[in-house]
Amino acid sequence: MFTNPEQNILRLGLKEGMRVADFGAGTGFYSKACSSRVGPTGKVYAIEVQKDLVKKLESEVKHWGLTNVDCIWGDIERRNGTKISDQSMNVVIISNVLFQAEDKLGLIDEAKRILKKGGE
C-alpha cells in the first residue's frame, strides 16, 4: 500500500523558499503537495525516468497552475542523472520508488550528491 503524500510532507517541515527533489515523481502527488509548502520562492523538481509519465506530469502541473514545479526526465539511479546541481536541494523525496530501483546504491548516491549539507 502506498503512503499518503500530504501526511508525509507535513513531517518534513518544508518551509517557504526550500528546494525539493521528488525522485520517481510519477503522476506528481508528492510534487503537488510540496509545491504549496515551498511557495512561489521555492522550487520542486519532479524527476521521472518514464517519458510518458513526464509528459502526463507536465500536463498535470499546468492544469494545477503550479509555477514552481519543474518536470525533469532523468535517471535517479545514475550519477548526475537528475541533471540537478551538487548540494542544491534542501530535501530529497524517495517514496514508493526505492523498492523498484535496480541500483539502490546508485539512487542513494545521487540523492546524497544533490542534497545540501544538513538536508533531509
Task: Put a short name on every predicted segment.
Residues 1-18:
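Conserved alpha-helix/loop element of class I SAM-dependent methyltransferases that forms part
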Residues 35-36, 105-120:
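A short glycine-rich, Lys/Arg-flanked "PGG" loop and its adjoining helix->strand segment in the class I
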Residues 21, 27-80:
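Class I SAM-dependent methyltransferase SAM/SAH-binding core
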Residues 15, 39, 102, 116:
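Short conserved AdoMet
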Residues 77-91:
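A short acidic, Gly/Pro-enriched loop at the edge of an enzyme's catalytic core
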Residues 19, 43, 118-120:
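Short glycine-centered segments of the SAM/dcSAM-binding site in methyltransferase folds
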Residues 89-103:
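A short SAM/SAH-binding and catalytic strip from SAM-dependent methyltransferases
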